[in-house]
């Protein structure tokens, strides 16, 4: 450092010293200035000070940095010089003085250690990435989390669902207003199961049989409801006077009177006749035994309980005809009713239990199901047991409650309309209540409900016969209050006429019944006639489905049902005169001369009918046959002039009696009746009063047989048509028929002398009106009972000062005389005097419910509308008009000709043949309908299937009314349903009435349990519509008496529950338990809303005793069912050669474990078991809104049709169009249920499309109707639970749920499917479908583009045309590749063309066809067996299958088959897997790789790393659920000794487990279990594939051939001799297997038997390539083995086709789905 620098530093220091005092001085002066508050330099001084402070701060910082930098630089320079100069120099110098010696061995060992450590490091870090792809460790916890999440999802709907189960009126049966009305009762805590809520629930459960009820209707129906308590043992007589009874607490036994043995045998013999016999021959054989009065009724004057018929008029007529036929000349003959047949017997005939002595105790009777009543009132047998929540009244009793009031109107003083339970109409018991009910009902019909006290007193005094003393009534003590005597002695019944009904109820326990009295139904019918008709329609439908259908299909009582139509034709008489018949016949003949009758006469309506019933092949054959025979159909609407407004309104209350001029247009010849053609004619015969009717006063005075209708004579030529209604041969005669016989001249005048305008007086109008009047007559409709009296629906009493009495007791005659009767007197609201203001306010708040009834709903208007729909049809002889068990077409009135009514039965030797042809059925003629008769009556009432077949016996001319028109008009003129109910109930036979009392209608909501395993079997069930799942718990079978009590045991038992199957519409179950008197062997749970018919065990036993034919029929059905179930599980025969057995097919394979650690699935353990996956109803439900549901459904429906399934798709639009005006009505639920049940019968598959918002009722309907729910989701969307899915969970449905993931491209991102499935434990299966949705999105985005983009899109559209493609192809040949690539990049960047995705070239690989085959139970499976390198031939078999166009829907494999099958299932394409398999074979055949993998042979010779890596290189991170095609592989669990089936998890891991050959590879560890090769238990898993629902299976076996050479070496064996024997070429003894070979054979014992069983499995195509010359480890011969498989596959499939053994491949001959956009998909080129 020099002196200049020192001087410079000293100057700086001195300068700083001079500055500091100045700074301090300035600061001090500044402070003084501030203190003084004055000074002009304050601002300048402050600014100077701030600048100085900033300068000083930055100076200090810079000084510190400069000093630190200088020190760091000097230090670093020193360290670098030390390391680079001094230290190396020291090492070099010192190294010259040090000497190190290392031996070569140490060097080699050191290098080996370094190499091994490096290799293990690289192997563990880089080459073992597959180890991270382990199995899901916490499977149990995952499932528990899923269940918890599902429970959380259900938690939101817990209260609503609990209320839904308890309130049976939830949106389906009763209105929401009903919920509101009872919200005070049910609105409390659901956990409090109080008696009151239970009572209301039971009542609502029973009243649901009425269907939907409006709130005012429900209030009026139930406001007079009573409750009655019955002590145990008390007996309730069931007749119409009781009303509608419901058991709300306890149990009630229903008893039916025991039929006498003689009658029983006679009747049973009637229905055990030969096929050639008919009902007419039966009746003719019985005719001499029974006689009738001139009324056509039977008077049984026997004692109560013993009905011995005798002749009344003494004349027994005999017929000379061989078979009685219904013809116009024989309708005056009296046919005995079945009621009389069953109630007549000789005095000498004993009871059914004649072996029992009269001294048999009552307890013995009760033990056998019988009870006896005192004083000879009869013996009764148990029919059914009614529990709480079920109605006591039968369906016919309910109909009688509505129709009985009408009888009171027509005959106020009659003896009473007879209940079906009574035998004698004269001796019907009457009481004060019954009288008051009848007169009240009569007043209701006349619009005068309120009675003055004078009228009431007059009624009680003027009818003393009906007011018998209550003290003398034996029934007044039979059902009494708690204070009365319980068992009084009955007084003798000589003083009064009294009969016990045939059906009684006895309290099995202390019970409570709720009763709606009959006057409530009478008032309901008068006040709300439309609602009453809806109830009647509901009851008629249930009567048809429950009673008729069960009797027809299950019990075989078709003749009983057909007898109803026989009685109708015998009872009602309406025949057309000959001149009208000639009009019809001549017109058909004229048309036949000029033109083809088939084309010229078929009306649009009839052609529509023919096309509507092509749902199945049977209907197609029938309709095609009928279309050939149907010669002509005359549409009268073409020629009939339209009525003017003036002519259509001419009908007035006062009839106009004008003449009727008919112009006969079609006469081509002269007939004797031509003189009458220009004479005023009436279609109704002007008969004398004695022939037309009788004065009602005369009937009051006379009850003798002379007061009957005269017999009808045969129609003569030119005779006018006559209306003559026969009285019903049953005792309960309908009022609609008695109306025609009344002596009221004004009414008869209105009917017989209806005037018509001049426009109507044509031949068409005459024929039309005549046919309509005939059909309405058969329906029980006339002008009197179709009129609506004015003021009857006003709802206000005619006399404001009247009052009504509401009885407290059940029936006034039943009340005990000891207890005083309490009467509540109620005054009308008019008695209260309120202010006008309050009255107006109350009137505004309350909206009065009033049904809108058109004033044109009278007989004449109905007749005119019916006439417009009448058609004339002509059938040739032998034409099948209506076939049995097909939809009835409508109502037929026979104008001329004969129709045979036949029924078809299956012969006994064919009942077990499931493949029988329908032509082999026996046909039996029941009766014949001649001119003037009616056909198709029952099937047209509810528009359902016909129970019989109608065949034209001769050329037949009929008047036809289509069922669509009949249903529409009956719905408009709703009073027709009342008349139909009257007619139908009067025609039912006693046996049908007994069935109606005993059969129960059950309705189950989704997830409801019908019965549990271990419950007593109390009946047989027949599924009317819906679906049930059968569950079985093996643990409960082992210990049936010990049931788990705590939650843990219940959970464990639930895990072991297995699904045995599912039952659909028309199937029955429970017969085995009832026949064997054992408990239920399984549980039944409703998959969706289900309706069932229950045949009680007591009824079945009763029918078995009375009618053995029914018992035989049911036994055959049970035997057939058991035989069908046992064929799959029966012991297969042992296949042997001579006396040496070769295969024992009964050796069982270890089943797949059902525990959670062995089940690799996200759902149930049986999620993949689809052996009965023939779903009838499928619902397509999106997970969230915005998905193309309709487009997807359209493709799926089209695919179903291509695979041969008759399918219909339903969305909200099609359903609303069917419902018509009821679309938004509360009646839509009832209409929907019938419509859906009908579609399930017409079509094999019904697809419900949920195309509405989530809160829509249609969405809920789709979920409730589904056997299988398909959840639609877009694969690349978020896997969160959508709003539709939450609705599905809230519905608590147990239907099978499938997830469909839609992909734009035919590839799946690894792990993507798991994200969808792990949070959805309710999903049973999933599918990957290619469905390009960008087309829909891009089409909507075109509108938002600008003008330039629109021009480019126009160019793009031109390119897509055919001309544009040709031009583009020609240009592309001339341009170089570089220019073409530039143009393509430009177009893709600027023109925004639609993205094009790849689809497979082969059409049979269509994803929708694959989904349709799986859902319809027609899936095609491929099973690839194990065999080491021999399995490389699988690739050649796959190539042959693809070239043949055979699709594969499911793939399964073992060992090498699992590897090849997994690769094929992953891509579903042969080209990309070829290279992967070849690469894997090269790695395995590499000697150096195998040597590098050797280890110490304790467990195996290799570590398995190279093998694992080879598999992982082929599959990567892909999981099995990511495979495009469904796939599974098997393995052997040596820890649990079971077979494992893997369909979820990482693919490489379980494929490796299936290929783990013992000794060569170590077992795969999976959740604590060791897995080995699946070939040890089943080398060809065909049975698993069969259990998954595959109908056709191609099984490829490449295993080694078993050495079955017989050995003979004695009882001891020397090892040295074995070695010498192997070396000796001249030895005759075969080589003895070594220990290793014996162990291998021992391991494959189960597999060998499984293979033989798989070969004999139906539907399996066994393929065995010639690969015996190749060893297990010959992977180096890839090309050779592959070619062997390809060549053999082509030859094998070709031979199958030539020999006709190739199975039918559904959809193989169909083109691709027609609506796929061809320009939207591209085909993948054939390159790896």
From Swiss-Prot:
* Reactions this protein catalyses: a 1-acyl-sn-glycero-3-phosphocholine + H2O = sn-glycerol 3-phosphocholine + a fatty acid + H(+)
Give the subcellular location: Endoplasmic reticulum membrane
What's in the GO CC field? endoplasmic reticulum membrane
Q: Might you give the EC number(s) for this enzyme?
A: 3.1.1.5
Which domain of life does this protein belong to?
Eukaryota
Map motif GXSXG onto the chain: 1453-1457
UniProtKB keywords: Endoplasmic reticulum, Hydrolase, Lipid degradation, Lipid metabolism, Membrane, Repeat, Transmembrane, Transmembrane helix
Q: Locate the PNPLA domain: which residues?
A: 1422-1586
| Activity regulation details | Inhibited by organophosphorus esters.
Residue numbers binding a nucleoside 3',5'-cyclic phosphate 2: 983-1121
What is the annotated role of this protein in its UniProt record? Intracellular phospholipase B that catalyzes the double deacylation of phosphatidylcholine (PC) to glycerophosphocholine (GroPCho). Plays an important role in membrane lipid homeostasis. Responsible for the rapid PC turnover in response to inositol, elevated temperatures, or when choline is present in the growth medium.
Name the family.
Belongs to the NTE family.
What name goes with this protein? Lysophospholipase NTE1
List the source organism: Candida glabrata (strain ATCC 2001 / BCRC 20586 / JCM 3761 / NBRC 0622 / NRRL Y-65 / CBS 138) (Yeast)
* Organism ancestry: Eukaryota, Fungi, Dikarya, Ascomycota, Saccharomycotina
* UniProt gene name: NTE1
């Amino acid at each position: 450092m020099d002196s200049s620098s020192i001087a410079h530093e000293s100057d700086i220091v001195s300068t700083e010293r001079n500055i500091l005092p100045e700074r301090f001085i300035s600061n001090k002066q500044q402070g003084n200035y501030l203190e003084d508050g004055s000074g002009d330099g304050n601002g300048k001084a402050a600014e100077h000070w701030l600048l100085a402070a900033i300068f000083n701060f930055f100076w200090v910082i810079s000084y510190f940095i400069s000093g630190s930098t200088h020190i760091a630089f000097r230090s670093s320079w020193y360290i670098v010089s030390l390391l680079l100069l001094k230290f190396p120099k020291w090492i070099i110098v010192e190294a010259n003085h040090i000497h190190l010696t290392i031996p070569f061995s140490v060097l080699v060992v050191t290098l080996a250690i370094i190499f091994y450590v490096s290799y293990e490091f690289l192997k563990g870090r880089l080459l073992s990435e597959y180890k991270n792809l382990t199995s899901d460790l916490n499977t149990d916890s995952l499932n528990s989390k899923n269940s918890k999440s599902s429970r959380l999802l259900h938690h939101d709907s817990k209260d609503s669902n609990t209320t839904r189960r308890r309130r049976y009126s939830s949106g389906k049966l009763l209105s929401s207003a009903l919920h509101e009305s009872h919200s005070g009762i049910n609105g409390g805590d659901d956990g409090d199961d109080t008696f009151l809520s239970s009572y209301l629930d039971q009542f609502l459960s029973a009243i649901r049989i009425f269907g939907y009820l409006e709130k005012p209707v429900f209030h009026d129906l139930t406001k007079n409801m009573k409750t009655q308590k019955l002590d145990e043992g008390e007996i309730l007589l069931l007749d119409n006077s009781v009303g509608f009874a419901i058991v709300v607490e306890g149990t009630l036994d229903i008893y039916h009177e025991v039929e006498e043995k003689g009658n029983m045998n006679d009747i049973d013999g009637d229905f055990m006749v030969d096929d050639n016999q008919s009902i007419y021959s039966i009746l003719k054989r019985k005719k001499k035994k029974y006689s009738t009065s001139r009324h056509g009724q039977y008077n049984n004057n026997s004692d109560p309980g013993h009905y011995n018929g005798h002749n009344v008029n003494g004349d027994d007529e005999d017929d000379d005809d061989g078979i009685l036929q219904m013809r116009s000349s024989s309708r005056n003959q009296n046919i005995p009713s079945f009621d009389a047949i069953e109630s007549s017997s000789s005095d000498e005939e004993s009871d059914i239990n004649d072996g029992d002595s009269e001294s048999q105790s009552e307890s013995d009777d009760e033990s056998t199901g019988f009870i006896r009543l005192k004083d000879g009132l009869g013996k009764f047998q148990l029919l059914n047991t009614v529990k709480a929540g079920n109605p006591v009244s039968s369906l016919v009793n309910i109909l009688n409650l509505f129709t009985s009031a009408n009888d009171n109107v027509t005959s106020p003083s009659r003896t009473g309309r007879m209940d079906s339970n009574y035998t004698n109409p004269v001796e019907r018991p009457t009481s004060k209540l019954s009288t008051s009910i009848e007169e009240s009902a009569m007043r209701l019909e006349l619009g005068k409900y309120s009675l003055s006290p004078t009228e009431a007193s007059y009624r009680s005094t003027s009818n003393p016969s009906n007011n018998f003393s209550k003290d003398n009534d034996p029934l007044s003590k039979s059902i009494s209050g708690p204070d009365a005597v319980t068992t009084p002695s009955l007084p003798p019944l000589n003083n009064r006429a009294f009969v016990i009904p045939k059906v009684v109820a006895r309290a099995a326990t202390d019970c409570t019944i709720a009763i709606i009295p009959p006057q409530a139904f009478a008032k309901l019918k008068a006040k709300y006639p439309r609602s009453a008709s809806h109830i009647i329609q509901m009851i008629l439908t249930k009567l048809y489905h429950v009673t008729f259908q069960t009797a027809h299909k299950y019990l075989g009582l078709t003749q009983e049902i057909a007898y109803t139509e026989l009685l109708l034709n015998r009872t009602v008489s309406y025949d057309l005169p000959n001149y009208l018949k000639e009009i019809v016949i001549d017109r058909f003949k004229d048309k036949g001369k000029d033109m083809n009758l088939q084309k010229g006469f078929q009306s649009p309506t009839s052609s529509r009918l023919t096309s509507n019933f092509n749902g199945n092949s049977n209907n197609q054959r029938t309709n095609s046959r009928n279309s050939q025979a149907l010669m002509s159909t005359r549409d009268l609407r073409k020629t009939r002039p339209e009525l003017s407004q003036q002519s259509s309104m001419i009908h007035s209350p006062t009839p106009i009696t004008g003449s009727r001029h008919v112009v006969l247009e079609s006469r081509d010849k002269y007939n004797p009746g031509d003189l009458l053609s220009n004479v005023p004619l009436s279609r109704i015969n002007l008969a004398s009063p004695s022939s037309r009717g009788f004065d009602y006063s005369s009937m009051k005075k006379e009850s003798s047989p002379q007061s009957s209708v005269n017999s009808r004579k045969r129609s003569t030529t030119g005779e006018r048509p006559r209306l003559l209604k026969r009285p019903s041969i049953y005792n309960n005669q309908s009022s609609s028929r008695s109306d025609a016989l009344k002596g009221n001249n004004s009414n008869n005048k209105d009917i017989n002398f209806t005037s018509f305008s001049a426009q109507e007086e044509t031949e068409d109008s005459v024929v039309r009106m005549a046919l309509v009047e005939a059909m309405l007559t058969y329906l029980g409709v006339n002008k009197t009972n179709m009129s609506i009296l004015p003021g009857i629906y006003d709802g206000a009493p005619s006399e404001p000062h009247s009052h009504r009495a509401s009885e407290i007791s059940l029936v006034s005659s039943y009340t005990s005389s000891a207890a005083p009767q309490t009467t509540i007197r109620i005054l009308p609201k008019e008695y209260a005097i309120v202010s006008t203001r309050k009255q107006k306010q109350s009137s505004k708040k309350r909206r009065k419910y009033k049904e809108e009834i058109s004033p044109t709903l009278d007989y004449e208007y109905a007749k005119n509308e019916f006439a417009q729909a009448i058609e004339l049809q002509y059938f040739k002889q032998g034409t099948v008009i209506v076939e049995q068990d097909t939809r009835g077409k409508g109502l037929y009135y026979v104008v001329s000709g004969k129709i045979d009514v036949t029924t078809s039965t299956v012969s006994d030797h064919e009942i077990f043949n499931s493949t029988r042809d329908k032509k082999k059925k026996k046909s039996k003629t029941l009766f014949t309908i001649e001119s003037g008769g009616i056909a198709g009556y029952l099937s047209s009432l509810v528009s359902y299937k016909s129970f019989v077949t109608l065949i034209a016996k001769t050329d037949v001319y009929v008047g036809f009314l289509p069922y669509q028109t009949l249903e529409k008009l009956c719905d408009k003129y709703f009073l027709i349903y009342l008349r139909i109910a009257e007619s139908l109930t009067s025609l039912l036979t006693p046996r049908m009435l007994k069935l109606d009392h005993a059969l129960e209608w059950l309705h189950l909501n989704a997830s409801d349990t019908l019965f549990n395993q271990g419950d007593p079997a109390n009946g047989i069930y027949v599924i009317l519509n819906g679906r049930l799942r059968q569950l079985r718990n093996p643990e409960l079978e082992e210990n049936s008496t010990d049931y788990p009590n705590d939650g843990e045991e219940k959970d464990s038992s639930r895990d072991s529950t297995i699904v045995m199957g599912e039952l659909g519409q028309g199937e029955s179950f429970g017969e085995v338990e009832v026949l064997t008197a054992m408990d239920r062997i399984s549980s039944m749970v409703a998959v969706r809303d289900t309706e069932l018919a229950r045949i009680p065990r007591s009824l079945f036993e009763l029918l078995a005793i009375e009618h053995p034919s029914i018992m035989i029929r049911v036994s055959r059905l049970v035997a057939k069912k058991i035989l069908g179930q046992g064929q799959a599980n029966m012991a297969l025969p042992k296949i042997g050669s001579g006396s040496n057995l070769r295969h024992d097919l009964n050796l069982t394979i270890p089943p797949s474990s059902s525990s959670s650690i062995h089940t690799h699935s996200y759902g149930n353990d049986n999620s993949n078991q689809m052996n009965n996956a023939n779903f009838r109803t499928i619902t397509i439900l999106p997970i969230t809104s915005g998905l193309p549901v309709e487009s997807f459904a359209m493709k799926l429906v089209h695919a179903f049709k291509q695979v041969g399934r008759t399918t219909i798709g339903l969305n909200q639009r099609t359903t609303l169009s069917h419902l018509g005006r009821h679309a938004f009505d509360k009646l839509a639920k009832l209409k929907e249920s019938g419509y859906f049940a009908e579609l399930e019968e017409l079509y094999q598959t019904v697809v419900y499309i949920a195309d509405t918002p989530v809160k829509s009722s249609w969405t809920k309907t789709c979920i409730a109707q589904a056997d299988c729910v398909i959840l639609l989701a877009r694969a690349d969307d978020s896997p969160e639970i959508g709003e539709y899915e939450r609705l599905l969970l809230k519905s608590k449905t147990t239907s099978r749920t499938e997830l469909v993931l839609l992909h734009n491209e035919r590839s799946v991102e690894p792990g993507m499917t798991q994200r969808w499935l792990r949070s959805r434990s309710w999903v049973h299966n999933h599918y990957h479908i290619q469905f390009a949705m960008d087309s829909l999105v891009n089409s909507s985005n075109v509108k938002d583009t600008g003008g330039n983009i629109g021009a480019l899109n126009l160019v793009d559209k031109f390119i897509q045309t055919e001309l544009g493609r040709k031009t583009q192809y020609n240009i592309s040949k001339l341009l170089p590749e570089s220019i073409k690539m530039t143009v393509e990049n430009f177009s893709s960047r600027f023109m925004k063309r639609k993205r094009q995705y790849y689809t497979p070239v082969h059409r049979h690989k269509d994803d929708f066809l694959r989904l349709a085959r799986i859902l319809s139970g027609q899936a095609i499976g491929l099973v690839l067996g194990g065999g080491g390198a021999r399995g490389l031939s699988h690739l050649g078999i796959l190539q042959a299958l693809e070239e043949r166009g055979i699709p594969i829907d499911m793939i399964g494999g073992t060992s090498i088959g699992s590897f090849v099958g997994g690769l094929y299932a992953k891509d579903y394409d042969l080209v990309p897997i070829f290279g992967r398999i070849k690469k894997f074979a090269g790695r395995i055949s590499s000697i150096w790789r195998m040597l590098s993998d050797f280890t110490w042979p304790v467990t195996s010779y290799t570590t398995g790393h190279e093998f694992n890596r080879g598999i992982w290189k082929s599959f990567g991170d892909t999981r099995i659920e990511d495979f495009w095609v469904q796939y599974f592989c098997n393995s052997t669990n040596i820890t649990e000794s079971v077979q494992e089936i893997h369909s979820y998890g990482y693919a490489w891991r379980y494929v490796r487990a299936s290929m783990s050959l013992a000794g060569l590879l170590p077992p795969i560890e999976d959740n604590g279990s060791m897995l080995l090769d699946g070939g040890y238990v089943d080398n060809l898993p065909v049975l698993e594939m069969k259990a998954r629902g595959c109908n056709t299976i191609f099984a490829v076996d490449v295993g080694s051939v078993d050495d079955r050479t017989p050995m003979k070496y004695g009882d001891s064996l020397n090892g040295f001799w074995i070695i010498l024997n192997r070396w000796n070429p001249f030895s005759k003894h075969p080589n003895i297997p070594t220990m290793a070979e014996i162990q291998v054979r021992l391991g494959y014992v189960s597999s060998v038997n499984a293979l033989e069983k798989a070969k004999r499995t139906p539907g399996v195509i066994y393929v065995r390539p010639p690969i015996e010359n190749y060893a297990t480890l010959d992977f180096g011969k890839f090309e050779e083995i592959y070619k062997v498989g390809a060549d053999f596959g082509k030859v094998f499939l070709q031979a199958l086709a030539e020999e006709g053994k190739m199975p039918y491949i559904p959809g193989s001959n169909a083109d691709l789905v027609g609506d796929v956009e061809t320009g939207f998909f591209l085909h993948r080129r054939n390159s790896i």
